[in-house]
């Protein structure tokens, strides 16, 4: 079975420009989305370590905060034929809210019959689209990754640190269901928050292949960077020789605080 998975947390004016740019991504091509103009530069290792510690701390805090927000999610997955025509579509629109006892609950608002025939979407895939990036770059996971600082890139009004991220050891899929992230992240140089990521999950298996997904985030309530738009246009090549081109678009909108116990942890740094 083929699994399609999502990749993927207070300065208002700066974040507003970045949010508007993310909202416009649906109208641009994959090549435009992926353009990168990194200015190569070195930083002392202690400074790199400080940046990594700060943005991983923030990532943990924002993931916890996201669980207290309701939002709308629109997900569409397409398979693309040799001539560029759409050969199958999976569409699922949802309102992500809570049950009476506070658990996350997906209320489906639009879910037509899927016409996908070459790949399938599993319940686990849908769970990944719930809004919380399954590849947690949090303090507890830092030891599992190599973070390579590449330099800086300016996107709209934001100056961003750019890091390549790769697992030190690829998990053995025969022994564990753990997946790790391999790809690239962009970190705001003032607030030290991840505002963009591009990568995929590893390991892959004979039947489960994952696309490279690019995710942009938007500033919510002036303090959190939550997923805004995810996009993939990739070719999945399976061990039996089957090759499937797929395209995925996921939009997250209308974030609202659904519970009141969200707290911002102040950092003394």
Map each language-model feature to its residues.
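Extended interaction regions within the primary functional domain
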Residues: 1-4, 26-29, 225
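N-terminal secretory signal peptides that target proteins for export/translocation
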Residues: 1-13
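Bacterial N-terminal signal peptides
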Residues: 14-27
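Structured extracytoplasmic
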Residues: 32-182, 189-196, 200-211, 219-227, ...
